Amino acid sequence: MRALLLSGCLALVLLTQQAAAQTLLVVGDSISAALGLDTSQGWVALLQKRLADEGYDYRVVNASISGDTSAGGLARLPALLAEEKPALVVIELGGNDGLRGMAPAQLQQNLASMAQKARAEGAKVLLLGIQLPPNYGPRYIEAFSRVYGAVAAQEKTALVPFFLEGVGGVQGMMQADGIHPALAAQPRLLENVWPTLKPLL
């Protein structure tokens, strides 16, 4: 009888621990979807391992889709929030907006709306900033790069100013297409995010 009681208590503790796990939702594009790599090799998978190794009870949901834009992320977000109920939302979008020459003002509006929707559901928000290559022209690049800081200030979200710091344009860090981070870059991407993400946990 005592053994059964102890077994029941242990099961209750385990169930309670499982129920306590919070969700971290990543909404991104091909960079976070680890295009060209196995998803288990991407920075988001490395983040899940880092959280476990450091004792953070989080379940990471990677809702990143290759080719996605800020408009696509905004359209998908309400259903993701309802289904996953995240405590923290990481937004990594805008690169495809820039590559398509979309208006920075529209990008800013979309990202701000995503942050507002996430915060309305009680989630903290971390925005990962993207910069464009120099061939897009200084005026467009400057307007684009200002978007992320403006959204972070307006919506009071955490910000990584340049997610691809030490990766973009660096020899050996990019795949052959020159756009997507290589396997060697994935740990660096995690390190770019971690110092800003950790205080939000």
UniProtKB/Swiss-Prot annotation:
Question: What reaction is this protein's catalytic activity?
Answer: a carboxylic ester + H2O = an alcohol + a carboxylate + H(+)
Would the keyword Cell cycle be found if you checked this record's keyword annotation? no
| Matches recorded under Pfam families | Lipase_GDSL_2 (PF13472)
What are the record's GO terms for cellular component?
extracellular region
InterPro entries listed in its UniProt record: Ester_Hydrolysis_Enzymes, SGNH_hydro, SGNH_hydro_sf
Alphabetized GO MF terms: arylesterase activity; carboxylesterase activity; lysophospholipase activity
Which EC main class describes this enzyme?
A: hydrolase
Q: What is its main location?
A: secreted
* UniProt KW Acyltransferase keyword: no
- Which residues constitute the signal peptide according to the record? 1-21
Query: What are the entry keywords?
Result: Hydrolase, Secreted, Serine esterase, Signal
Name the source's superkingdom.
Answer: Bacteria
Give the subcellular location.
Secreted
CDD domains documented for this protein: Lysophospholipase_L1_like
Per the Swiss-Prot or TrEMBL record, the active site comprises S30, D177, H180
EC number, as in UniProt = 3.1.1.1
What is the recorded function of this protein according to its Swiss-Prot or TrEMBL entry?
A: Esterase that exhibits the highest activity towards Tween detergents and p-nitrophenyl esters of short acyl chain length. Also displays a low thioesterase activity towards palmitoyl-coenzyme A, but is not active towards acetyl-coenzyme A.
Family to which this protein belongs: Belongs to the 'GDSL' lipolytic enzyme family.
Q: What is this protein called?
A: Esterase TesA
> What organism is this sequence from?
Pseudomonas aeruginosa (strain ATCC 15692 / DSM 22644 / CIP 104116 / JCM 14847 / LMG 12228 / 1C / PRS 101 / PAO1)
